[in-house]
Amino acid sequence: MPVRFKKDIQYYKFCLYGFLKNQRFFDPFLMLFFLEKNLSYTQIGLLYSVKMLTRTILEIPTGVIADALGRRGTMIFSYSSYVVSFIVYYFSGNYFFLIVASFAFGVGDAFRTGTHKAMIFEYLKYKSWEDQKVHYYGHTRSWSQVGSAVSSLIAAVIVFYSGRYTDIFLFTLIPYLIGLALLASYPKILEGSGVKKPEQSVTDVFKKVLHEIFSSFKNLKSLKIITSLSSFSGYYMAIKDYLQPVLQTFATALPVLLFLDNKKREALIIGAVYFIIYFLTSRASKYSGRSAEKFSSLLKPLNLILVMGLVTGILAGLFYKFNIIIVSVILFIGIYIFENIRRPMAVAYASETFSDRILASVLSIESQAQSLIAALFALLLGFFADIVSIEFSFIITSLVLLVTTPLYMLKNK
């Protein structure tokens, strides 16, 4: 199917949103930030789980709020929660404040996920470009990955000159405050058809949205679809930051930039690798639509990438175990690429399967499932990393998810 949407002002706003959203300068160094504070992997896993479980608990009600009372306000509240989180991370002096910051970050995620995707699809519906979902979402998502690539270089410079991981949270405030202003400029048509009208009471609006949600999820098939779509993304969210200690080991062993101290050398090498990762994932996301068109239906590539990604996780652990670190790093990069090819397909598949009227809620439920899976596997990864080793934590968690795939693989309608 040829690309036929117009790159208008709103298209560029969506792209700019994705770019600014991923100016998370802490992303390439978050786990190293925690390790520098002498936390165990189990404690780190708990922080990730707090963030994910907060997102899980709040996911469905925030989706309902977005569908029923307005998506722009929901997004603005989300960004405000992120700002609070960054400030607390910056000033955190003990584990309790790290938990508070993780909670605030989880609140921000809960109010954001699903909502912005629904705004994009609302715009496609308004423009009669509904058949362009994979292409359009893939294009806008690719700008998120470009943002991450630029962010990784800026983060490396910040750590290089400051010598402190903490400062990256302070600098992250700048793009997020700009993002707040951008969201406020979105047109009202993106609020969705479920927004409360003057003649309707708030109770009536919520009842209507909730009724449609329960109607969509009253059978096991719908739940199976959500589990299948969210499984690999949840796994990815839990395992992706473990690339950082792997890269730290790689940077220490690499005989380059030896005139610099370890932290400066690690900052430059990790920043450069993450730049390459996000450049590749931006291409993967952008061409997700073309990849999907090679198959007769979306469920085939969704199932295939799920299995390939989990096998890649097992192999990454095995190569790290045998100290072939460069291959382990390359395989980790493969997991990032698989996620960014699969994610636009998953979102498009959900939008084709469920009613447009409750799309924000459906996507929030799917994102909630991601968060629950990520919370569980973050704890498992941390636990096994402490009692056995990091490499075996990769192997065990990937294997657990792989052997259970027959339970939730997508089937023909």
Locate each region found by the language model:
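Juxtamembrane intracellular "pre-TM" segments in multi-pass secondary transporters
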Residues: M1-D8, K188-T227, L258
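Helix-loop junctions at membrane interfaces in 12-TM secondary transporters
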Residues: K7-Y11, Y90-S102, L318-F332
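Substrate-agnostic recognition of the 12-TM MFS/MFS-like secondary transporter fold
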Residues: K13-L32, L47-A66, G70-Y82, F97, ...
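Loop-to-transmembrane helix entry
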Residues: L39-V50, Q132-S142, D167-L170, A251-Y278
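C-terminal ends and interior cores of transmembrane alpha-helices
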Residues: S80-N94, G289, V307-F322
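A membrane-interface helix-boundary motif in multi-pass transporters
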Residues: V159-I174, V256-I269, F383-L401
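Helix-loop junctions on the cytosolic side of multi-pass membrane transporters
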Residues: Y165, T172-Q200, M409-K413
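C-terminal transmembrane helical hairpin of 12-TM major facilitator-type secondary transporters
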Residues: L299-R342
